[in-house]
C-alpha cells in the first residue's frame, strides 16, 4: 500500500484526497519511483478544475513533476536501475499517470536521470517551464540561429527558460518585464 493523491470531482484543492492504494509493479516501458519531492504547476491545478487540455477520468490521479529514486523497473525500462536518482518529465497524460504519491509509475520516455548536484526539490521542479518554452519557441515558432525574439514576462519561470532556449539555438532574446526589481 502507498499513499496516493486522487480526486473524485472537479474543484479546488479541497477535492484532493490522500488515499491508500495497492501499487502494482511497473508495467512494460515503465519505471516505478519512490517519490522524495513534488513540483507544483499550473497545469495540475487546471486539470483538477477541469480547465486543462484533457478532462480528468474519475477517480483521477494528478501530478506531472516528481523526483525520487527508482524502486523497480518494468520490462523495456533499459537505462534505469533500482536506486537511480530520477525526475519525471511532464510528457504523459495525467489520465494514465499521476506522480502525487509515495510510490508511482511513469513511462520510461518521461523519466530522466538527474545530477547529484540538484536537491530533490530542484530536480522535481525544473521541467515544466522548459517544455512550455520549447514547445512555443521550437515546435511552434520554429526558432533558429540568427532569429530575434521578444520575451514578455521574461522574469517568470517560462520566460527565464525561453531566454536560455533562445541563447542555446543562437537566437537573440529581448527580455521584457514589468518592474526593474524583477531583473
Say what each PLM segment does:
Residues 124-183:
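Mid-domain Rossmann-like dinucleotide-binding core that forms the NAD(H)/NADP(H) cofactor-binding site
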Residues 43-49:
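Cytochrome P450 core scaffold surrounding the K-helix E-X-X-R motif
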Residues 94-108:
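A structural motif shared across PLP-dependent enzymes of the aminotransferase-like
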Amino acid at each position: 500500500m502507498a499513499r496516493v493523491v486522487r480526486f473524485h470531482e472537479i474543484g479546488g484543492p479541497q477535492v484532493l484526497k490522500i488515499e491508500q492504494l495497492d501499487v502494482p509493479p511497473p508495467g512494460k516501458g515503465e519505471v516505478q519511483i519512490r517519490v522524495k519531492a513534488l513540483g507544483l504547476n499550473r497545469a495540475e491545478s487546471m486539470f483538477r478544475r477541469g480547465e486543462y487540455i484533457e478532462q480528468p477520468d474519475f477517480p483521477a490521479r494528478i501530478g506531472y513533476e516528481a523526483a525520487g529514486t527508482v524502486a523497480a523497473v518494468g520490462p523495456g525500462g533499459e537505462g534505469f536501475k533500482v536506486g537511480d536518482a530520477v525526475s519525471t518529465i511532464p510528457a504523459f497524460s495525467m489520465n494514465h499517470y499521476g506522480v502525487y504519491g509515495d510510490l508511482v509509475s511513469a513511462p520510461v520516455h518521461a523519466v530522466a536521470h538527474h545530477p547529484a548536484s540538484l536537491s530533490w526539490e530542484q530536480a522535481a521542479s525544473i521541467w515544466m517551464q522548459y517544455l512550455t518554452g520549447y514547445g512555443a519557441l521550437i515546435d511552434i515558432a520554429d526558432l533558429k540561429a540568427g532569429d530575434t525574439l521578444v520575451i514578455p514576462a521574461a522574469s517568470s519561470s517560462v520566460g527565464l527558460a525561453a531566454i536560455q532556449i533562445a541563447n542555446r539555438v543562437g537566437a537573440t532574446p529581448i527580455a521584457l518585464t514589468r518592474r526593474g526589481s524583477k531583473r
